[in-house]
A protein has these predicted regions:
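Generic enzyme active-site microenvironment
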Residues: 30-31, 157, 202, 284
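Active-site-adjacent segment of FAD-dependent monooxygenases/related oxidoreductases
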Residues: 41-44, 49-116, 130, 340
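Conserved FAD-binding catalytic core of PHBH/FMO-like flavoproteins
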Residues: 111, 118, 124-128, 132-264, ...
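Glycine-rich, N-terminal phosphate-binding loop of Rossmann-like dinucleotide-binding domains
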Residues: 38, 159-160, 291
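Extreme N-terminal starter segment of soluble prokaryotic enzymes
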Residues: 2-5
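Glycine-rich FAD pyrophosphate-binding loop
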Residues: 22-43
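Conserved mid-domain beta->alpha element of the FAD-binding
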Residues: 8-23, 109, 262-345
Length: 394
């Protein structure tokens, strides 16, 4: 089999890249290790930056998002007993974020892929990348027990942190930057109305809290917990009680509890590799970078990578511009590091660090008072939260 662009991974970044390239008349084949049901079963973030929303619209897959998604013009912070609203739109010349779950984004992209008739192969195994430095790289893989070979011009590695794409790059090429945070997030999804119209980020001496939502009838809550905790030790009742202990009474009185649809503990990690390309292999999204979820940047940074890569490939195929191929890594990384910085900043600002000394604790408190107590500080948070601009490719 032959194609122009081979895409490894059928998560939202791989599907979005495939859709944009398909719309531009560029042939793609997507390979995915899991089943469609497994991919849709992943519970992930649900906050879309304004630039991500625009990219989904550009791809022609935003009809349901625009009909069912919730536009948020603000967000709220809690600390030291204070509730601090952040007027996102007022502070960013009218920009906003969209509450629309990653599962729904993936569902829409899957439907668009199926409607296009463009090939996608699920359930592949033993995926291997060959000759990435040549002008005709190939991928071999097993599908339904048969060894298959896919020839292509370019490979997009959209297969996540544990995927084969990054691992296929020879040792000594990539520089890794990593920080593992000393706590995790315990998340609970429930079919209950959100406790607040806007998302709430709360600092508390017992640990950070995020009150999020997927719709007007589905809520997502997170608690900072020790890495040693096991999800089996957290009954629904224990979760709700701990959540109440970290929220003010005015919110507790409005909190609707219920049976959990999903509950899990996720470790927090900051991770980047440089460069994000090796020959004609391009790393996209989690294959190249991971952020703690505090800044809602994971899916949005993946979409940012897609934005740069699809435009570079369009220029190559439509205008013969091979000079832009080498620019992908630097373009993507410039925005990745800004997203990493904001995620690091939000995590440092709002979590409880048991091992920090008294001076660091005072500095953390001073940061909260400054950033959440001045228009300049609130503007910094707002412009990063709604998403920084993407550089033009051509």
């Amino acid at each position: 089999m032959k194609t122009q662009v081979a895409i490894i991974g059928a998560g939202p970044s791989g599907l979005l890249l495939g859709q944009l390239l398909h719309n531009a008349g560029i042939h793609t084949v997507i390979l995915e290790r899991q089943t469609p049901q497994y991919v849709l079963g992943r519970i992930r973030a649900g906050i879309l930056e304004s630039g991500t929303v625009d990219l989904l619209r550009e791809a022609g897959v935003a009809q349901r998002m625009d009909a069912e998604g919730l536009v948020h013009h603000g967000v709220e912070f809690l600390f030291d007993g204070q509730r601090v609203p952040v007027a996102l739109s007022e502070l960013t010349d009218g920009k906003s974020v969209m509450v629309y779950g990653q599962t729904e984004v993936t569902r829409d992209l899957m439907a668009a892929r199926a409607a296009s008739g463009a090939p996608i192969v699920y359930g592949v195994s033993e995926v291997a990348i060959h000759d990435a430095k040549s002008d005709r790289p190939t991928i071999t893989y097993l599908s339904e027990g048969e060894t298959c070979r896919l020839e292509c011009d370019f490979i997009a590695g959209c297969d996540g942190f544990h995927g084969v794409s990054r691992q296929s790059i020879p040792a000594g090429i990539l520089q890794t930057y990593e920080s593992v945070w000393p706590f995790g997030w315990l998340g609970l999804l429930a079919d209950t109305p959100p406790v607040n119209p806007e998302l709430i980020y709360a600092h508390h001496q017992r640990g950070f809290v995020l009150c999020s939502q997927r719709s007007l009838t589905r809520s997502r809550y997170y608690l900072q917990v020790p890495l040693s905790d096991k999800v089996e030790a957290w009954s629904d009742e224990r979760f709700w009680q701990e959540l109440k202990s970290r929220l003010p009474e005015e919110l507790v009185s409005r909190l609707v509890t219920g049976h959990s649809l999903e509950k899990s503990i996720a470790p927090l990690r900051s991770f980047v590799v440089e460069p994000m390309q090796y020959g004609r292999l391009f790393l996209v999204g989690d294959a190249a970078h991971i952020v703690p979820p505090t800044g809602a940047k994971g899916l949005n940074l993946a979409a940012s990578d897609v934005n740069y890569l699809w435009r570079i490939l369009r220029e190559y195929y439509h205008r013969g511009r091979s000079d832009l191929l080498a620019a992908y890594s630097q373009l993507a990384l410039d925005r990745v590091w800004k997203g990493e910085r904001f995620s690091w900043f939000m995590t440092r600002l709002l979590h409880d660090f048991l091992d920090q000394n008294a001076f660091d604790a005072k500095m953390q408190a001073a940061d909260r008072r400054y950033y959440l107590g001045s228009r300049a500080g609130l503007t910094t948070i707002a412009e990063n939260y709604v998403g920084l601009p993407m550089e033009r490719v051509a």
